[in-house]
């Protein structure tokens, strides 16, 4: 009986540790390191480039401060089974790599930000609409 109780306690302990993991934050470059943001709508191909530093800083801040981890994983280069999405590409000067992308989309009346192979976050609908409104 003690053996089963020990196994049960070990199982509960491991479960508690994995269930209480820290929430992931979306990873974006610092606004000062970004030279350009390009927002492209898929599948239409409509695009806009943003080079003004104040606007770049606002977009980065809005995305960072208005996302909440869903715990979902991203296993692909772009969202799967999503017909319409925005690709927000961040171009910057860095010796290791020079661009990064975040996909924004709506699914079942909720809005999401997805980084390839990194994760999926909920993003406030107002921020999604503001960024998508830059295409008009």
Say what each PLM segment does.
Residues 1-9:
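Positively charged n-region of N-terminal signal peptides that target proteins for export
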Residues 16-19:
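C-terminal motif of bacterial Sec signal peptides marking the signal peptidase cleavage site
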Residues 21-23:
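Bacterial signal peptide processing site
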Residues 69-109:
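Short, structured surface segments that line ligand/substrate-binding pockets
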Residues 92-136:
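Short, well-ordered, aromatic-rich surface patches in folded extracellular/luminal domains
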């Amino acid at each position: 009986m003690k053996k089963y109780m020990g196994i049960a306690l070990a199982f509960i302990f491991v479960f508690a540790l994995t269930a209480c993991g820290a929430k992931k934050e979306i990873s974006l470059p610092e606004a000062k390191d970004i030279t350009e943001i390009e927002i492209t709508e898929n599948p239409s191909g409509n695009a806009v480039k943003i080079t003004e530093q104040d606007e770049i800083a606002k977009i980065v801040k809005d995305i960072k401060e208005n996302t909440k981890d869903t715990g979902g994983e991203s296993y692909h280069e772009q969202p799967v089974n999503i017909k319409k999405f925005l690709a927000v590409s961040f171009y910057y000067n860095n010796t290791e790599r020079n661009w990064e992308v975040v996909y924004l989309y709506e699914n079942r009346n909720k809005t999401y930000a997805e980084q390839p192979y990194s994760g999926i976050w909920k993003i406030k609908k107002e921020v999604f609409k503001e960024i998508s409104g830059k295409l008009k």
